[in-house]
Design a protein with these regions (language model features):
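Active-site mouth loops of central-metabolism enzymes
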Residues: 77-97, 168-177, 246, 324-334
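Mature N-terminal, pre-catalytic/accessory segment of carbohydrate-active enzymes
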Residues: 26, 31-87
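Secretory targeting and sorting signals
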Residues: 2-31
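Active-site cleft segment of glycoside hydrolase catalytic domains centered on the general acid/base Glu
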Residues: 123-135, 160-262, 276-291, 337, ...
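Hydrophobic faces of well-ordered beta-strands that scaffold small-molecule active sites
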Residues: 68-75, 113-115, 150-154, 196-200, ...
Length: 409
């Protein structure tokens, strides 16, 4: 979900591509080192080399191969993302599409599913909440029937993509009123969906930007801990594990405070940039969780390519550019290496759950050309969409998808 515009564009693409399509899988991954079928273009060569070096540093982190690891291998169920909800959703094929994809995820070998059920969709005071509650009840039943472990991210709706009246709902929220409403929704998620994992805070910087109210500054670790405590106070968990955390680009002292001053059951850690500072933060987060006797759940991870500097770029054009370059096939070897290293590391450190973010890349990439690269992000993504649609219809997987299938086996 890092950053706001990045998620926005990713979800628009996911919604456009997945609604109404069946997803099938085939093939297995090679155990050999991944090789690029496309040459790295000169404009990206330096960044590619830097990221490849960072991946080597990631792979060199202490850890050992763990055979028969219990770590849940999952990915996001994009058609069920709350940012795609609309009035009348039960009269569309969105539930059918989400159901089909859940079936295919199990066929791929995955043992878990991540769903974003966004605040305030399930609040009784929010328009059409009964319909959204029914949708999530039904898709949760499908996930449970498939024997998949369900993780829910309770992130706020993104006002820049959702057509729902979320801006007016956010207006005037205070930390206390937001936490009280989030508590109410968390209880509904538990009662209706019965997830194994429920994350109530994952990227405090993104939450702060999305809610955009002067009294809600979750960038402060102290305020973040206060928020988590308010949401969890009196929550009837009924077997659901409730957690929170940050991204690997955020100072690990934030997570240390959450572990020390809140009753979270696990630490949720998002992994995108992997510069040395991010890897250092990540290893500190892992050590802190172990010292607190808490497991780690990774509800989102992917190799960030817009910069190799370790901090996600935060201007208006950065996120569309990231989504644009994600489509190019010369990145496939790095994405394969990232997923392989991420899963190995998660298993070696006994993470409970790991779930990649850019699942459309499991199905297709496209060849870079200078002419394509000169086009807008919207046009590049439109061309990518056609390739994803063809792969979904034919049952194909990209090399990255085959790698993940091999990892999940």
């Amino acid at each position: 979900m890092k950053k706001v515009p990045t998620l926005s564009l990713a979800l628009v693409v996911a919604g456009a591509m997945l609604v109404g399509l069946g997803v099938t899988t085939s093939g297995t991954a090679s155990a050999t080192e991944p090789r690029s079928s496309s040459p790295v273009p000169p404009p990206y060569q330096d960044r590619y080399n830097a990221l490849r070096s960072q991946l080597s540093n990631f792979a060199a982190l202490p850890g050992r191969t763990v055979p028969h690891s219990p770590t849940i291998i999952a990915s996001g169920l994009e058609p069920a993302n709350g940012n795609l909800m609309r009035p009348g959703v039960l009269n569309t094929n969105l539930l059918s599409t989400a159901t089909t994809l859940a079936h295919r995820m199990k066929t791929l070998g995955e043992t878990g599913v991540t769903i974003q059920v966004n605040f305030p969709l399930l609040l009784s005071s929010f328009p059409d909440s009964a319909e959204y509650t029914t949708f999530y009840r039904d898709i949760a039943r499908v996930v449970h029937q498939e024997g998949l472990t369900l993780a829910v991210e309770q992130n706020p709706l993104f006002g820049n993509i959702s057509t729902l009246p979320v801006a007016s709902f956010y207006a005037g929220l205070t930390l206390q009123s937001y936490a009280a409403a989030d508590h109410q929704m968390a209880q509904t998620v538990i009662d209706v969906m019965h997830p194994t994992y429920l994350s109530i805070l994952t990227e405090p910087d993104t939450y702060t930007a999305v809610i955009h109210q002067p009294d809600i500054n979750l960038n402060s670790p102290t305020i973040g801990a206060q928020f988590v405590n308010l949401v969890m106070d009196g929550l009837q968990k009924d077997g659901t594990l409730v957690g929170g955390g940050t991204g690997s680009w955020i100072n690990p002292s934030y997570d240390q405070l959450l572990l020390a001053q809140t009753p979270i059951d696990y630490l949720d850690m998002h992994v995108f940039p992997i510069a040395q500072s991010d890897l250092s933060n990540m290893t500190s987060q892992v050590s802190s969780a172990a010292a607190a006797h808490k497991t780690i759940v990774v509800t989102e991870c992917w190799l960030y390519k817009q910069s190799s500097g370790g901090t996600p770029l935060d201007n208006v054009q950065a996120a569309p550019d990231e989504q644009k370059i994600e489509t190019y096939s010369f990145w496939e070897p790095l994405d394969q290496q990232f997923l392989t290293t991420m899963v190995r590391y998660a298993r070696s450190k006994k993470f409970a759950f790991v779930s990649p973010f850019s699942t459309l890349n499991f199905f297709a990439y496209q060849t870079w050309t200078s002419a394509l690269d000169a086009q807008s992000s919207q046009l590049v993504r439109a061309a990518f969409n056609q390739k994803v649609q063809a792969a979904l219809s034919s049952g194909g997987l990209s090399a990255v998808g085959k790698t993940y299938q091999h990892l999940a086996a």
